[in-house]
């Protein structure tokens, strides 16, 4: 057996290692100073932009990538072409940016530093969104509208509940899945300390638009429960005694509803990612992104030692992507005053995960 290769990453204050896929020289990335979250937002965007520009220029393409380790088990690694190297390095840089940013923001005195320092409501929400796989020793915090249904399929295949990810069955989002909230405190502590922990993020406004189009355009239960209430609250001139189906909520009405909602009590499909997964309270080993879903998911499957035949599902043919043009169109239909009230509710999702704030100026929206 060849000697085990060195692991790469940065050590947290607790001594644990944040894993990356390849080494990068110290001159590649500069340290960011810790500042309060409101100021950090813009500093992160500027710093991230410079690093990603370096990636686009191909400055790091020659760095070699070691195979990920998988909890000490032998893994039949998927074959990787040489063209994957640049993508691996780019992903590593994105991880480095996110980890430095998270450490800066989460180092503030008023931020939670463990699961047990959260309020009962915050802890309940978090533990109900973390899925457990004991065989491969990992925890996955799922975020609705960030490919979580496909990840649940993968977990069911790994546990033997499904033969493969392509089986055409209606997804039951609770059956055959183990949630961290199902376990007693001592077992929760053990898994948080010893298991590989990951989550996936998405551009916050694209995630909201995806939820809006899906839930209010296709799901009758959401139209009745939320759509009808939104119309009663925010639509001018509607007759109070008129029966409302809730299937024609506008995106502006939806944003007004979000502005008035408490982020900690929102429906999970539009609750901020920060509130769902609490990245300050849990030290995630890997934070993947929807924008790099295929490569990041492939890395996770290798990292946890998934069998060769287990793969991440392809997107369904009926899937309607949120393109930049589509997002631009919808955001520009919302009055500026509502967006200015909405964005602060998701400011930690933008700043922690390195997403720039959307440009919705009048000049930009003319195009």
From Swiss-Prot:
This is Carbohydrate sulfotransferase 14. It is found in: Golgi apparatus membrane. Catalyzes the transfer of sulfate to position 4 of the N-acetylgalactosamine (GalNAc) residue of dermatan sulfate. Glycans are attached at residues 99, 359. It is a single-pass type II membrane protein. InterPro entries: Carb_sulfotrans_8-10, Sulfotransferase. Residues 1-34 are cytoplasmic. One of its GO terms (molecular function) is sulfotransferase activity. Its EC number is 2.8.2.-. Residues 56-367 are lumenal. It comes from Danio rerio. It is an enzyme of class 2 (transferase). Coiled coil: none annotated. The gene is chst14. GO terms for biological process: carbohydrate biosynthetic process; dermatan sulfate proteoglycan metabolic process. It holds the Pfam family Sulfotransfer_2. 3'-phosphoadenylyl sulfate binds at residues 144-150, 202-210. Belongs to the sulfotransferase 2 family. One of its GO terms (cellular component) is Golgi membrane. Its main location: Golgi. The chain crosses the membrane at residues 35-55. Keywords: Carbohydrate metabolism, Glycoprotein, Golgi apparatus, Membrane, Signal-anchor, Transferase, Transmembrane, Transmembrane helix.
């Amino acid at each position: 057996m060849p000697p085990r290769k060195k692991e790469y990453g940065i050590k947290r204050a607790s001594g644990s290692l944040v894993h990356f896929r390849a080494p990068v020289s110290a001159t590649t990335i500069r340290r960011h100073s810790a500042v309060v979250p409101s100021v950090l937002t813009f500093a992160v965007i500027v710093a991230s932009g410079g690093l990603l520009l370096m990636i686009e220029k191909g400055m790091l393409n020659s760095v070699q990538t070691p195979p990920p380790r998988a909890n000490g088990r032998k893994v039949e690694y998927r074959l990787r072409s040489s063209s994957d190297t640049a993508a691996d390095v780019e992903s590593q840089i994105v991880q480095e940016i996110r980890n430095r940013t998270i450490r800066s923001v989460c180092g503030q005195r008023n931020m939670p530093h463990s699961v047990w320092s959260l309020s009962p409501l915050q802890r309940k929400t978090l533990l109900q969104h973390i899925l457990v796989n004991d065989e491969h020793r990992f925890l996955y915090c799922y975020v609705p509208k960030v490919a979580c249904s496909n990840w649940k399929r993968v977990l069911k295949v790994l546990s033997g509940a499904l033969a493969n990810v392509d089986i055409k069955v209606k997804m039951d989002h609770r059956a055959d899945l183990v949630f961290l909230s199902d376990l007693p405190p001592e077992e929760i502590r053990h898994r948080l300390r010893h298991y590989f922990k990951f989550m996936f993020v998405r551009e916050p406004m694209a995630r909201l638009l995806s939820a809006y189009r899906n839930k209010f355009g296709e799901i009758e239960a959401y139209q009745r429960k939320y759509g009808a209430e939104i119309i009663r609250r925010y639509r001018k001139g509607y007759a109070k005694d008129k029966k409302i189906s809730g299937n024609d909520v506008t995106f502006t009405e939806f944003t007004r509803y979000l502005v008035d909602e408490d982020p900690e009590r929102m429906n999970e499909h539009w609750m901020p990612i920060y509130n769902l997964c609490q990245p300050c309270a849990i030290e995630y080993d890997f934070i993947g992104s929807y924008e790099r879903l295929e490569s990041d998911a492939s890395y996770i499957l290798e990292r946890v030692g998934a069998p060769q035949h287990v793969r991440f599902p392809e997107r369904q043919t009926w899937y309607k992507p949120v393109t930049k043009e589509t997002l631009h169109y919808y955001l520009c239909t919302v009055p500026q005053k509502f967006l200015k009230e909405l964005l602060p509710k998701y400011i930690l999702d933008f700043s922690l995960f390195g997403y720039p704030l959307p440009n919705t100026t009048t000049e930009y929206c003319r195009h």
